[in-house]
Amino acid sequence: KELTSPMPGRVLKIMVKPGDKINIGDSLLSLEAMKMENILKSDGEGIVKEIYISEEQIVDKGEVLIEFQ
């Protein structure tokens, strides 16, 4: 399972790290788009397998941000 960017923007803060156990509703990262901060939250449970982005990185809509197992 993967978290993809719902919009183009800039990653402000990554709130998880590989190996973290996540639950539904956990905050994963914040993304700035059109001068607004958006918190992306988990829609499932699992463990963070890999993070493909870094803070301050510009991302495109649909880009894979985090992979879960």
Model segments located where?
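Structured functional modules or segments
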Residues: 1-69
